[in-house]
C-alpha cells in the first residue's frame, strides 16, 4: 500500500482522528493496537479497500468497514443465523428461531471454535475484534441484540448464500408439530417458497448467472468471467481485502462475513449460482411410545428417540420472555413435522468449521488445482460454481455436497427411515459429479438450471449420473437465452460479455405470444374481444420480444404473462407442468384472451391507459436504509429496462407494486455485477445496486442507481496504481 503512504506524507489526504480514551481498558488498548495494523481506503464510490499486516488484521478491518456501512444488516444476519430473531422482532419469530436452533447450537460452535486450527481461530478472533471495536468507537450505535461479538459466532453463518438449506424447512409444519397447533399444518403464510409452490403461484426466480469464456473465444485470448448474483438488493457489499500474507480478494461479501463470497483475486475468479442438486433428504420415521419414551424403528431394532430442550427467548413490551420446546431427533436428524402418522426427520450438510475453512481458503486459490482442492471439502452445499483463471482454465462445479445414495429410491420425496438401504455413504467427489474443465465449446454457464446444457454440445450427459444429482426436469428460459448469446462466438471481450449479460431478449414470450395471437385470429368478428383487443394484438404482433424502457409491448406482455399464468397455475400444478408451459400448450383461447383483456384493464386503471411505456412502471427506488424498504410513487426513482428473470431476461429485476403504489419497485435480481478479464494483470468492471452505504445521508447511498439501471458498469480499482487517482479517504479503524 505504498500509494497510501505517499498520499499521507504529501498531505493530500486528511485523516480524521478520534480522541484517545484517558483510561482505556486492557481490551480497548489491545483493539487499538490491532487497529493500527489495518488501513482502510475508500475509493470515489465509497468502496472499502482494506489492508492488514496479517490475514487476521485484514478480517478485523473488513468487518469494521462493513459495520460502518450498515451495522444493522451485519447484526441482523447473525441474529437470524443464531436463532435470535425473536429477541428483536418478538413472538411472531419464535418458530423461525426454533428452526435455526435445531441446527445451530452455541455450545457445539464454541467447541468447534476451540478445536479449530490456529490460523482459522485467528481469523475468527479478528472478526469479533473488528465488530467489537466498531461498537466501542461508535457508542451512538445501539445493537438490537448482540452487544458483544464472540469469535465462535462466526461459525453460525459460514456459507454466504442468500437462502440456506435450513430455510427449506417449512415453518408452519414445524409449528404444527412443536406448537401443538394442528391448524398450522394446512396454513400457508407465504413465508416459504414451498408454500407458494403448493398454491401454484410462480415464484420470483432467485439465484444467479455465471459465465466463463475460454481464451480461444476471446479477442485478447484471456479468460473472462461474469459474476451476476440475483439476490435481494443490498444483501452484499462490494469490497477489496488484502494482507501481507497473500490475501487479495475483490468482490461481494455477505454482510457480516469475512470472506469474499463471489469475486476474484489476481489469479482466479469464482461465481456461485443456486443449484438444483438434491442435497437434503427427509426420512419417514416409524415412532412408538413405550412408557414415557419414544422409540423409532431402524432395520430390525427400535432405537430411542433423542430428546432435548430448546429455549427461545422473545421480545415483549415489558422485556424478554421465553418459550421452551422438547425437540426430537433420530440419527438422521431433527424431527421437523408429522406426515401421515410418521415423524419426518431432515438430514443436511451441517459442518460449520469445514464450511468456514472452504469459504475462506478458496479466496486465496492461485489456480484451478488449488481451487478444486478447496471444493473437495464439500460444504458449499446449495450452489454450483463457475470458475476462470489467469492460466486460461474455465470450469463448472455442479453442487458441492451430493450424498452418495442408493439410486433405487426417489430422493425428491421422503424415504423410509426404517430401511437401512436409505443411508448415505459419503459424498460424491468433484469428478463423480457433472463437472466440466475446459469444454471444447470454449464457454460454460449456469443460471440455476440443469447442467445438461452448461457448455452446449460439450455438456455433461444426463444418463451418466444418478437422478439425485439434479432435480430440474426442464430447461429454464434463462438457459435458452444464455445458449443463444454464448454459442458460436469467438469475439468476446469485457464489453461483449457485459452486453451479453444485458441482452434484452425475452425467450418466454417468443413461445407464449404466438398461441395468444393464434387465439385472437380464430375469434369471429362478432366477438366483443375482437375489437377490444385489436390494438393490443397489433402491438404484440409487431414486437421483437425485447425489453426496453420505452417499450409498450414489454408492459403489455408482462402484465398479460402474470395474469395468464396466475389463472392456469392450479391446473398446471395438478398435471405437473409449469404455469408458463401450460399457458403455451394447454390454455384455452378464452383463457389467453380474457387474461389479455384483464391485463389491459389493469394497466388502464393503474396508469391511465393500457398503452404505457415500461419505464413508467418498472422502477428502482431507495429512500431509506431499512432492510424492508418503503416505496412511494411520489418519491424519486429510476426507470429500469430489464424485467424479472422469469421471462428469460439474463439481467433480472424482481419488481411488483406495494401498498399505496401503482408503479412496480424492484427488491431483488441483479445486485453486484462484475465482468473480469484474466490477463497479465486483472481488469474488471462492476456495479452495485444503489450504492455501497446503507446510510441515506451518505453520498454513496444511491450514487450507482443510474449505472445499475442501465448496465453501465464502472472500472474496478483493483491495483494501488488505479486507486491512487480515485481515493476519497484513508484511515485506520477508529479514526472516523
Give the location of each predicted region.
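Acidic, low-complexity N-terminal propeptides/linkers enriched in Ser/Thr/Asp/Gly that mediate export
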Residues: 120-226, 231-232, 378, 390-394, ...
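Substrate-recognition/specificity elements adjacent to catalytic centers across diverse enzyme folds
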Residues: 19-236, 244-246, 251-259, 264, ...
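Proteins synthesized as precursors that undergo proteolytic processing into mature forms
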Residues: 357-383, 390-391, 463-515
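Solvent-exposed, acidic/flexible segments
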Residues: 102, 113, 117-128, 228, ...
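Hydrophobic h-region of N-terminal signal peptides that target proteins for export
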Residues: 5-16
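Glycine- and hydrophobic-rich flexible loops that cap the catalytic core of alpha/beta enzyme folds
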Residues: 246-257, 263-267, 272-415
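Hydrophobic alpha-helical segments
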Residues: 251, 336, 380-489
